[in-house]
């Protein structure tokens, strides 16, 4: 990796943001030998041992105090590893104008943590090494500074955020939170509801922060209204409110607001497959607001999905039961274990969570996820049945149709179709307009040649409700093929392939249909496309077609 690669990636990521829409490892002893230390630091970073990399770079920075590159690498590695004390100590030795994006973010976070909002704003508005402008973050900090002082002009300050800025999608939630800080719950309510509607994956977090703000204003009714939803975190927050306590996890100062914004932006960048900056933002958020409840969950998730499972598990297992988002930490822990094929450990942990006195339906659903991953479909269906019983008894958790759909799917994979059909029909009765349910039940019937008229009707309705869903379009085309309308099927399957060319099942279906009408060259092209992403057992079937042509023995089911 060239010496400028890290800086360039930071510049690119922050430029996109500014203009966009919407457990440490033990460090072995090492000798300070100049070039060898540099090589060791880079190797440690590539190996994911950022703590060791930071210490090696820091030692090298002591030897070469004039090197901006070495200092920058040391600070970056320290921040990414979570050693913000080391990063701050190193940053203090450099002119602030030379510091890179990550260091400037940390310095701003440090000033906010100390209650020095003016200094934080000045840091963000100042020039950054590499030429990246962090000024787009400053209006939010300045608005929170005014809100903390009871200055109603805070709300107007938010208008300084450009409409195309990455901060813009989060203005509603911060505007509502600032109004609550200013003691204006009635004015805050409609804005709070808009914020919830736009929150996406962060909905539970936003709801809880707003509920805490309303409770701080002694508005219990509006606080409870903020906590509508089936997530366990919301259920736990409601329990606290109903006992007369605030749920906590509030956002009512500049440090908390800055941290929450960084966490939200880290999710955006992670979805855009930007690797280094989301980790920096999460670590800076944790420093600026050490009690930010979702920060350790996001950190664990990021580490786990970036091949650092042991560090992820240390972080996730450190999330206390008093954290409203501890169920999310448990979910992430299980996913992390499954990702690295530690299935038995994942099952043991999931069963332990499900055996807790306050276990809920989500805990049983988590057990089902692990069992399904292990191919134990009957046991997974049993766990989902227990989850369904808990929800039907009034507990929190997924909607009943979701659990019935999942349970039906597990029973179908276990070749217990009669029982699967009962669960799937129940899901349909509970969610008659849901395209996923309609498609699953219709396709399952289609595969078995059962009541083909109704099967096609179900799939056609699903397709009408979700015309952009490639899998459902594929189901419709396959139904048409099974009913003998091959030319119509080819047109529909071509539409499905255009929507998602990477789906092996779609390409195989298209190939079978094309071969049936003698378009063998095009069929081979579709089958070859299917081979790219097909699973092993499907590959064997497709390879047979490529070798011998379509036969009843190798036709798609």
Where are the model-predicted features located?
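Generic helix N-cap/helix-start motif at coil->alpha-helix transitions
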Residues: 29-37, 49, 64-71, 96-106, ...
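Terminal, low-structured helical/coil segments at or just beyond the last alpha-helical repeat
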Residues: 249-261, 504, 516-557
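Alpha-helical adaptor scaffolds
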Residues: 143-144, 440-498
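TPR/TPR-like (Sel1-like) alpha-helical repeat modules
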Residues: 95-99, 128-132, 212-236, 389, ...
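N-terminal leader/linker segments that initiate helical-solenoid repeat arrays
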Residues: 21-91, 98-102, 122, 241-242, ...
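Residue-level recognition of tetratricopeptide repeat
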Residues: 42, 76, 109, 142-144, ...
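Alpha-helical repeat scaffolds
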Residues: 56, 84-96, 117-129, 151-164, ...
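Structural motif corresponding to the intra-repeat A-B loop/turn of tetratricopeptide repeats
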Residues: 47, 81, 114, 149-150, ...
């Amino acid at each position: 990796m060239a010496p400028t690669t890290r800086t360039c990636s930071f510049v690119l990521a922050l430029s996109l943001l500014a203009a966009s829409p919407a457990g440490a490892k033990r460090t072995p002893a090492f000798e300070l030998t100049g070039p060898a230390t540099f090589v060791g630091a880079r190797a440690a970073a590539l190996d994911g041992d950022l703590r060791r990399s930071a210490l090696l770079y820091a030692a090298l920075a002591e030897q070469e105090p004039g090197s901006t590159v070495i200092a920058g690498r040391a600070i970056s590695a320290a921040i990414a590893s979570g050693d913000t004390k080391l990063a701050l100590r190193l940053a203090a030795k450099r002119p602030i104008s030379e510091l890179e994006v990550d260091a400037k973010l940390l310095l701003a976070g440090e000033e906010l943590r100390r209650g020095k909002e003016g200094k934080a704003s000045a840091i963000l508005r100042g020039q950054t090494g590499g030429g990246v402008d962090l000024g787009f973050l400053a209006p939010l900090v300045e608005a929170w500074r005014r809100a903390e002082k009871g200055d109603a002009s805070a709300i107007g300050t938010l208008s300084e955020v450009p409409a195309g800025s990455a901060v813009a999608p989060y203005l509603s939630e911060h505007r509502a939170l600032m109004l609550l800080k200013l003691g204006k719950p009635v004015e805050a309510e409609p804005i709070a509801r808009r914020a919830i509607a736009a929150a996406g994956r962060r909905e539970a977090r936003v709801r809880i922060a707003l509920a805490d703000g309303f409770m701080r204003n002694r508005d219990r009714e509006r606080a409870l209204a903020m906590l509508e939803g089936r997530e366990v975190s919301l259920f736990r927050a409601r329990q606290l409110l109903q006992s007369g306590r605030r749920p906590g996890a509030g956002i009512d100062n500049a440090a908390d607001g800055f941290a929450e914004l960084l966490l939200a932006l880290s999710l955006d960048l992670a979805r855009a497959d930007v690797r280094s900056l989301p980790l920096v933002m999460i670590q800076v958020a944790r420093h600026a607001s050490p009690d930010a409840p979702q920060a350790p969950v996001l950190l664990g998730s990021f580490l786990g999905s970036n091949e650092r499972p042991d560090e992820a598990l240390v972080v996730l297992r450190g999330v206390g039961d008093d954290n409203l988002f501890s169920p999310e930490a448990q979910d992430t822990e299980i996913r992390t274990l499954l990702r690295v094929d530690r299935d038995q450990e994942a099952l043991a942990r999931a069963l332990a969570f499900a055996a807790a006195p306050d276990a809920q339906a989500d805990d049983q659903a988590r057990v089902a996820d692990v069992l399904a991953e292990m191919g134990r479909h009957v046991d997974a269906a049993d766990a989902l049945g227990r989850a369904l019983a808990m929800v039907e008894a009034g507990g929190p958790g997924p909607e009943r149709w979701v659990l019935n759909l999942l349970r039906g799917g597990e029973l179908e994979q276990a070749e217990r179709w009669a029982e699967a059909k009962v669960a799937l029909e129940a899901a349909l009765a509970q969610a008659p307009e849901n395209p996923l349910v309609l498609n699953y039940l219709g396709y399952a019937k289609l595969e078995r040649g059962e009541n083909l008229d109704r099967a096609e009707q179900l799939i056609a309705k699903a397709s009408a409700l979700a015309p952009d869903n490639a899998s459902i379009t594929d189901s419709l085309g396959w139904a048409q093929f099974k009913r003998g309308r091959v030319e119509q099927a080819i047109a529909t399957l071509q539409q499905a392939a255009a929507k998602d060319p990477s789906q092996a099942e779609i390409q195989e279906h298209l190939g079978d249909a094309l071969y049936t009408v003698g378009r063998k060259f095009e069929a081979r092209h579709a089958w070859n496309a299917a081979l790219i992403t097909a699973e092993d057992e499907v590959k064997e079937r497709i390879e047979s077609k490529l070798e011998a042509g379509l036969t009843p023995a190798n036709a798609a089911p």
